[in-house]
Amino acid sequence: MNAQLSALQQQAQQLSASVTRPIPGSRKIHVPGSRPDLQVPMREIALTRTPTLFGGEENAPVTVYDTSGPYTDPEVRIDLSAGLPALRRGWVEERGDTEQLEGLSSSFGRDREHDPKLDAVRFPARSLPRRARAGANVTQMHYARRGIITPEMEFVAIRENQRLDAIRDAGLLQQHPGEAFGASIQKVITPEFVRDEIARGRAVLPNNINHPESEPMIIGRNFLTKINANIGNSAVSSGIAEEVEKLVWAIRWGGDTVMDLSTGKHIHETREWIIRNSPVAIGTVPIYQALEKVDGRAEALTWEIFRDTLIEQAEQGVDYFTIHAGVLLRYVPLTAKRVTGIVSRGGSIMAKWCLAHHKENFLYTHFEDICEIMKAYDVTFSLGDGLRPGCIADANDAAQFGELETLGELTKIAWKHDVQTMIEGPGHVPMQLIKENMDKQLRECGEAPFYTLGPLTTDIAPGYDHITSAIGAAMIGWFGTAMLCYVTPKEHLGLPNRQDVRDGIMAYRIAAHAADLAKGHPGAQVRDNALSKARFEFRWEDQFHLGLDPEKAKEFHDETLPKDAHKLAHFCSMCGPHFCSMKITQDVRDYAEAGMKEKSQEFRAGGAEVYRQG
């Protein structure tokens, strides 16, 4: 180990306190499953007692979904250079259908492993990859179609329910009926239902056998709406330590998956550090790295280079690949009259390759070969929308929908191989055209999970596209999209920093939750009900803690009312002590109750007769 490596490790170990401190007002809990090694992480928010003025009852803790891994647990010691514990290794090994390799299969991976110039940035804890035994298929879809409930399936069933069965307060369980547009929303998520949805292709459980550190999570329209956060270095910004911290930051605020879109130096090494320290599924766009291998010349790409890249990343543990196999040669001319042409990086790379060679997209012609790789490691397809609209003027055009139809064709091929598959979607779409996107995707792709970037509903707000897109995300999530890819305020302007990542995730957690409420997902309204009760009872700390971002809520409150005494006050700085609508409402209730008591006493004093002569 040289001095440079020591410096990098020291830098990587110094995750900032803002990233690792416990989330205020809550603690990490683990809900047991049917076996000792199945412990499902959640977060329990402690609530204070209702003030005597409002009844003085106890308020039970509220359990919520948690994506932060061990990083917010003060009982856990984090060692980034060792990586997270291999939670799922035993589950993978006990199935007996994989084998540990003696070394890396990818020629590029082997070259990187033995290059002494990379000692300073290489992840220090070497682990040998696993692969399916000859003739075996190790995907969760393959197991599900054979009627097997894996530990991963039980894990996500427990996780989705969020201990709903433990709630005894009927007020918290109150919920408006949802409109699910034909989705099969369940009152209780069972392992059997998880298995059946994966077998049908309506849900995916992205868990590469070489990412045993991951905590299983499910993506499907009949489950909680998930969100993805993008990170990654570029030629002009960010390094390995910054990307690891950005990962931990993203999952702290609620990223269900993270895509590493690195295009700068040390892509391979950066990804290894990220995967080994990630409790959530990691996705990539392999064509980005393949392009780096040919010095950025799209026309120089070959199937052999791309295939080696897929194997390299699969053996590192990438859980899902964006593959732009639907960008066909015949669709490229359809983009010529668009306002913004082809805006997808992957789409433009493949379009340029097709035109340079005047051949069909090699990702399309080699799709079954790709399926063979995917099922050997259980990598999930995220079929890329390389021809998505880059402005609302281009929405729902022939190029976009032609590609979507091809993605439906490819989905059927992937399912023939029992490879889990989700479909990527737009993009920029005005509100009135959003449902058409969802309906066509369900129809063309057999209800495979839809994974959309927004969509952005207007193009006039650079710097605020986390808002323009969250509007569309909430709508399309309600209509049936299973996962929403976040957009940050920096969209179209630059690479996001930490605050941008936080703002983007918060916008999308709001959108996803709004979609779950509208669909009528079981228990979706519990947190809203708990927070509303706390708000009416002026339990300020509980309001902060029940919010999606407790730190910001407290920060905003304390800007004008910073004293501890203000946490007990029956007003906020918006209205002050004399004009608080909730305080006035409580006074009205008190007057009404006093009036009823007075009338009751008058009734009894009059002989308690229902009818009296005047």
Swiss-Prot record:
The Gene Ontology CC terms held by the record are:
cytosol
**Cofactor note from UniProt?**
Binds 1 [4Fe-4S] cluster per subunit. The cluster is coordinated with 3 cysteines and an exchangeable S-adenosyl-L-methionine.
Positions of Zn(2+) binding: 428, 492
Keywords per UniProt: 4Fe-4S, Iron, Iron-sulfur, Lyase, Metal-binding, S-adenosyl-L-methionine, Thiamine biosynthesis, Zinc
What Gene3D superfamilies does the record point to? Answer: 6.10.250.620, Radical SAM ThiC family, central domain (3.20.20.540)
Per its record, the protein catalyses: 5-amino-1-(5-phospho-beta-D-ribosyl)imidazole + S-adenosyl-L-methionine = 4-amino-2-methyl-5-(phosphooxymethyl)pyrimidine + CO + 5'-deoxyadenosine + formate + L-methionine + 3 H(+)
| EC number annotated for this UniProt entry | 4.1.99.17
The cofactors it requires, by name, are: [4Fe-4S] cluster
**InterPro entries for the chain:** ThiC (IPR037509), ThiC-associated_dom (IPR025747), ThiC/Bza_core_dom (IPR038521), ThiC/BzaA/B (IPR002817)
Q: How does it assemble?
A: Homodimer.
Job description of the protein:
Catalyzes the synthesis of the hydroxymethylpyrimidine phosphate (HMP-P) moiety of thiamine from aminoimidazole ribotide (AIR) in a radical S-adenosyl-L-methionine (SAM)-dependent reaction.
Protein name (Swiss-Prot/TrEMBL): Phosphomethylpyrimidine synthase
